């Protein structure tokens, strides 16, 4: 699950007795990288560097980030996610070839579980950005972007494929949901907890 995370590999070289002290430092580094990559993404759309800085800090220290501190691998994904958005913008607006494939491969390696959600988000992001005047998408660029996405997934297959096979071998995936569990959470407080995490 963590084999593609660069932060995980840092923890493997540290002595076990240091882990208690290393985790807060690593979380700080992850939040710093998240702020930096979000800043790099946001600065493309605002005039003021201060606005980009505030946006980067809001991203890095959002309710989602802080609520999920106890899952230290969540921050691995959010630290590098803006790179996918930057790569898409570069591919479409600057005709940079290969950058999107590398970003897709990186995110596919970091965490396969979050990668599926990121893929859905990027499709929605592309659709929404097509309505913007500063997004110069053409059918040719779209197909090149789709090809780069496929290449990125293929590059990440050395981690994605074993992970998929392990998940498919799990006997719990054959279980089914019945009744209201198919439509809604059975815990009545979960929705409120999700909304609460936004603040």
Spans of model-derived segments:
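Short hydrophobic/aromatic helix or loop-helix immediately within or flanking a transmembrane segment
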Residues: 1-17
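Periplasmic/ER-lumenal interhelical loops and adjacent helix-loop junctions
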Residues: 6, 141-142, 149-199
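Short, flexible segments with low predicted structural confidence
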Residues: 13-14, 60, 136
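Alpha-helical structural elements of signaling/regulatory helical domains
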Residues: 17-20, 93-94
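Short alpha-helical transmembrane interface motifs in multi-pass membrane proteins
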Residues: 19-23, 144
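Membrane-embedded helix bundles of polyisoprenyl
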Residues: 27-28, 32-45, 49-131, 144-164, ...
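Membrane-interfacial, low-structure loops and terminal tails that flank and connect transmembrane helices
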Residues: 135-141
């Amino acid at each position: 699950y963590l084999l593609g995370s660069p932060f995980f590999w840092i923890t493997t070289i540290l002595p076990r007795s240091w882990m208690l002290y290393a985790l807060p430092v690593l979380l700080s580094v992850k939040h710093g990288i998240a702020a930096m990559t979000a800043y790099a993404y946001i600065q493309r759309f605002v005039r003021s560097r201060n606005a980009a800085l505030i946006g980067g800090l809001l991203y890095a220290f959002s309710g989602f980030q802080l609520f999920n501190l106890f899952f230290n691998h969540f921050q691995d994904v959010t630290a590098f996610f803006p790179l996918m958005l930057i790569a898409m913008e570069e591919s479409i607006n600057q005709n940079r070839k290969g950058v999107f494939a590398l970003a897709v491969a990186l995110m596919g390696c970091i965490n396969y579980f979050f990668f599926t959600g990121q893929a859905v988000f990027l499709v929605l992001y592309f659709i929404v950005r097509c309505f913007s005047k500063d997004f110069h998408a053409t059918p040719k660029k779209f197909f090149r972007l789709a090809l780069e996405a496929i290449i990125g997934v293929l590059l990440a297959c050395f981690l994605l494929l074993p992970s998929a096979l392990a998940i498919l071998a799990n006997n719990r995936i054959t279980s089914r949901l019945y009744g209201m569990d198919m439509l809604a959470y059975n815990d009545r407080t979960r929705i409120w907890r999700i909304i609460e995490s936004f603040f």
